[in-house]
Amino acid sequence: MRDQKYGAVVNIGSVAGQLGVSEGAIYGILKASVTHYTRCLATELKQHGVRVNCVAPGPMKTARFEATRIVDPEMMDSQKAPLVRYGEPGEIANAVAFLLSDQAKFINGQVLCVD
């Protein structure tokens, strides 16, 4: 990408890295570091024409999520959750595809919360 002076990277963070999540401190800290790394890398690689962004999913309907249930189900009914449902993996894929596309060629160093 550096040699071509063009490219895009999308890291996967989590809204848990943006918000405090009950009983999820370590997970939240790790995902917050992904957000910080994204912004640092975006600054470092912009001179090479490489964009770096991050998608931060909210609670997703996956087998792992069903097994761990890190997010309190009551949160889904509170005002903290923008939508009262779990996301689907395909919705995250759409956000990643957008950030990798030329439609997002003026977006760099951003975190797109998909929740």
Language model segments and positions:
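Catalytic tyrosine of NAD(P)H-dependent dehydrogenase/reductases that use a Tyr as the general acid/base
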Residues: 27, 35
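Conserved catalytic-site region of short-chain dehydrogenase/reductase
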Residues: 17-19
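Conserved SDR Rossmann-fold cofactor-binding beta-strand/turn motif
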Residues: 51-61, 100, 113-115
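C-terminal substrate-recognition "lid" of short-chain dehydrogenase/reductases
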Residues: 85-114
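Residue(s) in the substrate-gating loop at a strand-loop-helix junction
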Residues: 14
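Active-site helix of classical SDR
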Residues: 30, 38
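Alpha-helical segment proximal to the catalytic Tyr-Lys
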Residues: 43-47, 105
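A glycine/serine/threonine-rich, flexible loop-to-helix segment
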Residues: 26, 47, 57-81, 86, ...
